[in-house]
Amino acid sequence: NMRDIIFTFFNYFVFFYTSMLAIFFVTFAFLSFISLKRRKDYYVESYMRKTIKESPYTPGISVIAPAFNEEKTIIDNVNSMLALEYPLFEVVIVNDGSTDSTLEKMTEYYELVEVPYAYIERIKTRPFRRLLKSSNPKYSRLIVVDKENGGTKADASNAGINVASHPYFICTDVDCILEKYALYRCISPIISSEKQVIAVSGTMLMANGCVVKDGQIIDVRTPRTPIPLFQ
C-alpha cells in the first residue's frame, strides 16, 4: 500500500543521505589531514633551514659534478648549481678530458685562472692536470678540476672528492637540476638524527617538458614525446 511505499522510500532516502554525508566528512577529514601535514612539514622545514643557516656549526657541503663534452649546456648547468641555497658550499666541476669547448667556455664565462693547489690523491684516479678558480668574487664557490679522461663517471667523481674541502659531498650529474633547497634537505637528517647517518639520497624525476628558469623548475609539465612520457 501507499504507506509502505512512502516508508520504504523514506528509509532509502535516509540511508543514501547519511551515506553521502559520511563520505563527505571522511573525504573532508582526509583532505584536512593532508593539508595539515603539508603545513606542518613546511613549518618544520622552514625552521630547520633557519636553524642551519644561522648556526656556526653548520657543516660545509661540496657539490661534485663530472662534465664530459657538455659545451651546449655547461654554463646554464653550472649557474643552476651556484644558485643553490645553503650557507657553506662549493661547486666542484670535474672536466673529464672533454674534447669539445666545455673547459674553454667555462674559462671565459667564469674568468677562470689556474691556481696552485695541494692535490692529495686519497682515491686513485687518472692524472690530475690543473685546478682553476674564478678571479671574479661572484663565482668564489666554483672550483674546476681539469683531468685526463678516466673512462667512467666514477673516476671523475673520485677526483672531485680528492679536491673537495668540505666534510660532506654530493655527487651528481652536471646536467641534473637540483632543487633550490636540496642541500638543506640532504643535511637535515644527518644533523638531526640521534643515530649516525652515513648517506642520504633524493628523489629523481624527469624534467622533460618542464619549464626551467634560472636553473630552477618553475612549472611542472608532462613530457610530450613518447619515451620520456613512458619513463
Task: Name the predicted role of every residue range.
Residues V115-N158, N162, H166, K180-Q231:
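Long helical/loop segments within the catalytic core of UDP-sugar-dependent glycosyltransferases
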Residues E45-M48, E70-A83, E104, D155:
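Short, well-formed alpha-helical segments that are part of the catalytic scaffolds
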Residues P59-S62, E90:
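Cell-envelope/extracellular polymer assembly enzymes that use nucleotide-activated donors
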Residues N95-V115, N149:
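A conserved acidic beta->alpha catalytic loop
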Residues N1-S55:
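N-terminal membrane-anchoring/stem segments of glycan-assembly enzymes
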Residues D173-I177:
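The conserved acidic donor/metal-binding loop of glycosyltransferases
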Residues F169:
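Short aromatic/hydrophobic "clamp" motif used to bind/position activated sugar donors
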Residues N79-L88, E108-P116, S193:
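Short, acidic, metal-binding catalytic loop of nucleotide-sugar glycosyltransferases
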